Amino acid sequence: MTITLGKSSKEEQTLFDTVDDWLRRDRFVFVGWSGLLLFPCAYFALGGWFTGTTFVTSWYTHGLASSYLEGCNFLTAAVSTPANSLAHSLLLLWGPEAQGDFTRWCQLGGLWTFVALHGAFGLIGFMLRQFELARSVQLRPYNAIAFSAPIAVFVSVFLIYPLGQSGWFFAPSFGVAAIFRFILFFQGFHNWTLNPFHMMGVAGVLGAALLCAIHGATVENTLFEDGDGANTFRAFNPTQAEETYSMVTANRFWSQIFGVAFSNKRWLHFFMLFVPVTGSWMSAIGVVGLALNLRAYDFVSQEIRAAEDPESETFYTKNILLNEGIRAWMAAQDQPHENLIFPEEVLPRGNAL
């Protein structure tokens, strides 16, 4: 008998292998390497938002009450942006503005940059989580690719737009009413609804809702009646391998309705992926354009020319009237650093706006 002496064929695990095994272990809530980014950032972003909406005022940045402590409700509470005078400062707690004073940091709007940056990295961590899990179970990464759409919208609206303007002040505050105020601002100062990138975004979102409704109804309509259960949910074994609905019947139905229909499940579902993701990406691209103050669709160029050239003619539409009304109504309070004062006769009155 021959005995071979030597090293074991199985090498000892390195520290990296040990950590990798622990992070990617099969457990109720998967952690993974992406979790090192996702969980801390999501925790801090949500914690900062709950803290800000509960306790922190916006008196020093916007002249507003914005917390539950001051009497706001879920609709009016917000984590408000820093003052315009702070420009694009990261407002670090230990930075020159707050100098380690937590109360001062909150008063200056430090929670907004805290929530925005941790929120952005949290969303990126969630997309990486989908990549990591897809790779580990040998799926294609289309979930992660689809999630790039809300990330693009968040980053363009909350980070790129204010970076193109004079400061974080012009980003949306984190609150329900604050987001609607920001939408009004976008319309009044950028004529956003007439922007073709916004139109593509609306087409994507509403088109996706239509596709989702049609798809869900069609699948329900064409379920095989081969179960004994009283309803859809009891008629099938949840782990059965066979199809539960008839693609052929669905194709025949829609061919009769429209004259055309999806005949391939892959193309159908890719289209349902493509429509909302592309629409959201187009909206994000449009917001980047607004960050740079591109003036193609907001009529400001026509208004300036009309003001400078008496012989210039322009259509004075209800759209222009709406935008001028929004600007007059919002500007004085929305941009307090400009010290704008409008005479009473030019401001909207009664129920005009």
UniProtKB/Swiss-Prot annotation:
Q: Which family does it belong to?
A: Belongs to the reaction center PufL/M/PsbA/D family.
Task: Give the residues the record marks as binding pheophytin a.
Answer: 130, 143
Q: A single GO molecular function, which one?
A: electron transporter, transferring electrons within the cyclic electron transport pathway of photosynthesis activity
Gene encoding this chain?
psbD
Task: Summarize where a plastoquinone binds, as residue positions.
Answer: 215, 262
Concerning NCBIfam families, the annotation shows: psbD (TIGR01152)
- Protein name per the record: Photosystem II D2 protein
| Catalysed reaction, written as an equation | 2 a plastoquinone + 4 hnu + 2 H2O = 2 a plastoquinol + O2
Q: What class of enzyme is it?
A: oxidoreductase
- This chain's source organism reads Pinus koraiensis
Q: Which InterPro entries match?
A: D1/D2, Photo_II_D1/D2_sf, Photo_RC_L/M, Photo_RC_L/M_CS, PSII_PsbD/D2
Report the function annotation for this chain.
Photosystem II (PSII) is a light-driven water:plastoquinone oxidoreductase that uses light energy to abstract electrons from H(2)O, generating O(2) and a proton gradient subsequently used for ATP formation. It consists of a core antenna complex that captures photons, and an electron transfer chain that converts photonic excitation into a charge separation. The D1/D2 (PsbA/PsbD) reaction center heterodimer binds P680, the primary electron donor of PSII as well as several subsequent electron acceptors. D2 is needed for assembly of a stable PSII complex.
